[in-house]
């Protein structure tokens, strides 16, 4: 389970303070990167991006994420997510909205991780995406999760 963000002010302070320490100690907030794990072992690194978020493959964030994956021997991905029905660019998601996910492999480990589509532009359903998350862990999605996602 993911935890709710509880430390925005602390993190904003540290981010600003780090800039004061000089150009020769660069650091960055890696946005919304999750370590997908199973039994305390990392399975993949995923940077989740909203459908309106910018993806720049030459950015320091993406290049660093790719390098982290390579160094750890883990697949690294960008997963863009969106909804079929949303109120404005960053607005509330409508209750009848259908979520979609786009899985973009970043390194060689990711290209061999059983991505549900060979087309980086393909949008997959939430069920397909969550099934893939279970498969990354060598597991089968439980039927109760399938039933909940099919409602």
Annotated model-derived regions:
Residues 1-39:
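Active-site metal-binding core of divalent-cation-utilizing nuclease and nuclease-like domains
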Residues 25, 52-62:
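Active-site-adjacent loop/helix micro-motif of nuclease/hydrolase catalytic cores
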Residues 27-29, 41-43, 60, 71-73:
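Short connector loops at helix/strand junctions that flank enzyme active sites
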Residues 32-34, 40-52:
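Conserved catalytic cores of phosphodiester-cleaving nucleases, focusing on short active-site segments
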Residues 69-103:
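Nucleic-acid nuclease catalytic cores
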Residues 94-151:
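Helix-rich interaction surfaces within compact, conserved domain-sized segments
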């Amino acid at each position: 389970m993911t935890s709710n963000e509880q430390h925005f002010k602390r993190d904003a302070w540290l981010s600003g303070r780090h800039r004061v320490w000089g150009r020769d100690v660069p650091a960055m907030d890696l946005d919304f990167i999750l370590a997908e794990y199973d039994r305390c072992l990392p399975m993949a690194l995923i940077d989740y991006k909203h459908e309106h978020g910018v993806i720049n493959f030459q950015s320091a964030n993406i290049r660093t994420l790719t390098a982290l994956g390579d160094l750890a021997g883990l697949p690294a991905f960008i997963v863009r997510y969106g909804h079929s029905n949303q109120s404005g660019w960053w607005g509330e998601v409508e209750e009848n909205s259908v979520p979609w996910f786009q899985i973009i492999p970043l390194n060689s480990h990711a290209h061999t991780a059983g991505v549900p589509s060979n087309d980086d532009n393909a949008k997959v359903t939430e069920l397909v995406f969550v099934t893939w998350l279970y498969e990354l862990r060598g597991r089968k999605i439980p039927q109760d999760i399938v039933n909940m996602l099919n409602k």
